[in-house]
Amino acid sequence: MLYLPLLRKPQIPWNKGKLIGQKPPLKLREIWAIRIQLQLENRTKDVALFNLAIDSKLRSCDLVTLKVRDIANGNTILPRAMILQQKTKKPVQFEITEQTRESLSKWISLQRLETSDYLFPSRLHDSDHISTRQYARIVHKWVEMIGLDSTLYGTHTMRRTKVTLIYHRTKNLRAIQLLLGHTKLESTVRYLGIEVDDALEMAEQTEV
C-alpha cells in the first residue's frame, strides 16, 4: 500500500503585518507624576529603576541584567554607557542624565553595591537580579499609582517613552533608530506606529 505524506496548509501567523497590543508611551506630565510620587515615598530603588528605564530605552531583558560596572566607573556614574543587546547581539549606547545619575548613585550607595554586582538585585534566592516579569509588575504599579489603567501599559511603555518625545520634537527617525538599537529603519517605523508614507518622506529628508 502506498502512503502519501500528509500535506498541511502552511499557517500564517495571526499577527503578521499587524500592530497588535502596542503599549503607549508615557506623557511628560505622567513621567513627572510617577517620579515625584516615588520620591515622596522615598522609594530609592524605584526612582533609580524608573529614571534609568526612561533614559536607557533598553528592552526589559537588557535593563534587568545591567551591572554596576555597565553604568559606572568606580564611584562615578557615567554620562553615557554602552551594552551589547541580548536580542540583536549588537551594541547600543544610551545617555544617563544628571537626575538619573544622582538617583543611581544614591541607590548604589544605599545598597553598598560593588562594580560586579547586578544593579537591581533580586530578593529571591533563585535569581541574582530582578526578572523581566518582576519588572513588568513594577511598571504596572507605577502607572496604577497615578490612576492609569495598568492593562494598557507595560515594559515597552518605558522603552518607547523618551524616543516618542524625541520623535515628536525632531521627526528624526534615524536618530530614533540608533537610540533603540534597531538594525532596520522599518522596525523603528513600526515601533513608533508611524504611517509608512509619512515615515518615508521624513526618512528621505534625513541625512545619515
Give the role of each language-model region.
Residues M1-V208:
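Conserved catalytic core of the tyrosine transesterase superfamily
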